[in-house]
């Protein structure tokens, strides 16, 4: 892979804050830095961390936070990232956590992924006001190290478009139209391009379909047996309810295909379809779909690449 950031005066970061996971990616001075963690924050305190892989325990503005799995299991009051807002308290702490994970320079420029319906000037202005020109101070309470980082610039980019740039880089489609789909926890983002990489707004949209809809099948089946579980519990409990999950993802593989065929005109005939997102790791799609390599990181990688072009 070509390195996309070679200068050492600032570091470009691609940041994808989802409802389930936060993904951050950067290439700086010939090295790759990345992290994935659950989009959950909560109160933090000193405990033993031996049973946790890559625990996140940080201090921001003299307040201690658990982030990710640690917040989900150990915080007395965990908060999930349940909205599209990138400037809520939860989002701000996730930004601090991402910077703590990958920042290797004291100046960064960030491209933040947003859904189609949030790709607006008003949203951008709110994000710029919240982050741009701000100095981020974050202490890693586990390693007892601190970082002070200036966010020099920040911009937003559609998540589906980010998948496009991750896949295509500087190539231009000349043979067929292309659709790029990022499947998230609650929604899926579609970006559509005609030959020559001309963006088609009419076919680019946010659709209410994601991993939570798939796991609702498991949730309802459990209720039939008087077992009450939240969707995030079903999702995060690896090894539990595997038979029900297998059926859910088999059904979803078929329904997902039908949704795309309905939304995209002449899909699979005149259009190459690329799919990304962590949900793709569970679906069994036919060969007409092109699953992006390491699909859970595709949006963050694409955002970082876009940052190398615009900053």
Say what each PLM segment does.
Residues 1-178, 197-210, 238-311:
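Nucleotide/phosphate-binding catalytic cleft detector across ATP-hydrolyzing
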Residues 173-234:
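Aromatic-anchored, glycine/proline-accented short structural segments
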């Amino acid at each position: 892979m070509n390195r996309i950031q070679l200068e050492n005066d600032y570091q470009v970061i691609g940041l994808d804050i989802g409802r389930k996971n936060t993904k951050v990616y950067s290439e700086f001075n010939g090295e790759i830095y990345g992290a994935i963690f659950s989009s959950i924050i909560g109160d933090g305190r000193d405990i033993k961390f031996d049973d946790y892989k890559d625990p996140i325990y940080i201090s921001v503005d003299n307040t201690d936070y658990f982030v990710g799995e640690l917040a989900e299991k150990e915080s007395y009051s965990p908060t999930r990232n349940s909205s599209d807002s990138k400037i809520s308290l939860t989002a701000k702490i996730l930004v601090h956590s991402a910077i703590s994970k990958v920042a290797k320079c004291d100046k960064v420029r960030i491209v933040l992924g947003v859904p189609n319906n949030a790709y607006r000037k008003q949203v951008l202005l709110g994000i710029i006001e919240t982050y741009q020109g701000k100095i981020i101070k974050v202490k890693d309470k586990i390693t007892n190290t601190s970082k002070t980082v200036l966010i020099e610039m920040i911009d937003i980019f559609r998540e589906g478009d980010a998948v496009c740039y991750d896949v295509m880089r500087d190539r231009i489609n000349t043979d067929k139209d292309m659709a790029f789909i990022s499947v998230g926890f609650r929604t899926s983002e579609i970006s559509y391009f005609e030959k020559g990489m001309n963006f088609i707004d009419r076919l680019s949209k946010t659709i209410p379909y994601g991993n939570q809809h798939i796991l609702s099948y498991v949730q309802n089946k459990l209720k039939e047996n008087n077992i009450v579980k939240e969707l995030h519990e079903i999702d995060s409990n690896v090894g539990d309810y595997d038979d029900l999950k297998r059926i859910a993802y088999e059904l979803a593989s078929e329904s997902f295909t039908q949704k795309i065929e309905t939304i995209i005109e002449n899909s699979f005939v005149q259009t190459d379809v690329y799919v990304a997102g962590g949900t793709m790791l569970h679906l069994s799609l036919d060969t007409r779909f092109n699953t992006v390599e390491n699909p859970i990181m595709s949006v963050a990688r694409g955002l970082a690449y876009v940052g190398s072009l615009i900053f």
